[in-house]
């Protein structure tokens, strides 16, 4: 799943101090010195264009105070621009073997009837802000038919749903007989990553790092405080 590809980097003022991935799994609890930190998380595959391959990124700043428990949450949002293609049923009456290419300057995907349920994921570079498309097919008279266009100012975390349909009025006047509609919608897809500092365990009115001595049969109560950022499943105490 998406979590198997997750990479987490934690930075301090000195630079990168922790790195976790599928080979070096991040523990549930981290032991960090007091100070300011920045965490950056990525998940998925960052490729120019691919079907059903999301890519998530997220970052957050957090501070660790001495003697306190800290929990940092990173919200990872989708970094891709998405595209889907649908064909109206009447297209099959006027054109065959049709397909649509949707592409950027770095990646291209071909959509056919067999891929109408697939979602194309595109990574836009710094200057690329458009999705170009081309329709190719063969008319009933055997001649090839092509039509193309561009959707400008596309953004990430947004899906562009292309619908290709037959326009009989344009066909009758010799114009382009394919109508193209593009519906734009925001993609609200996130993954949360929680980074937790090790629980704080202290003695009540005594130093827990030092032994407690009692005479036989004359012990007294001793309280231990466990301060955790998240709910603990269990706490085990032992003595010798």
Language model features with spans:
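Extracytoplasmic cysteine-anchoring/structural motifs
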Residues: 1-6, 11-13, 24, 31-55, ...
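Short hydrophobic alpha-helix segments
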Residues: 20-21
């Amino acid at each position: 799943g998406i979590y198997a590809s997750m990479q987490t980097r934690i930075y301090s003022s000195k630079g990168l101090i922790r790195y976790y991935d599928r080979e070096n799994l991040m523990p549930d609890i981290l032991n960090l010195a007091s100070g300011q930190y920045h965490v950056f998380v990525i998940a998925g595959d960052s490729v120019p264009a691919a079907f059903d391959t999301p890519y998530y990124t997220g970052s957050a700043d957090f501070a660790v105070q001495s003697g306190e428990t800290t929990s940092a949450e990173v919200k990872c949002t989708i970094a891709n621009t998405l595209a889907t293609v649908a064909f109206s049923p009447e297209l099959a009456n006027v054109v065959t073997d049709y397909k649509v290419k949707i592409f950027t300057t770095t990646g291209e995907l071909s959509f056919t009837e067999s891929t109408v349920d697939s979602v194309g994921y595109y990574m836009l570079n710094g200057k690329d802000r458009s999705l170009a498309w081309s329709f190719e097919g063969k008319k009933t008279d055997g001649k090839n038919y092509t039509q193309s266009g561009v959707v400008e100012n596309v953004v990430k975390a947004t899906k562009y749903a292309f619908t290709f349909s037959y326009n009989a009025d344009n066909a009758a006047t010799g114009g382009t007989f394919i109508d193209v509609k593009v519906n734009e919608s925001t993609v609200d897809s996130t993954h949360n990553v929680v980074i937790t500092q090790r629980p704080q365990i202290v003695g009540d009115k005594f130093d827990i790092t030092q032994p407690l001595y009692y005479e036989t049969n004359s012990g007294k109560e001793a309280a231990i405080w466990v301060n955790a950022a998240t709910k603990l499943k269990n706490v085990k105490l032992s003595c010798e």
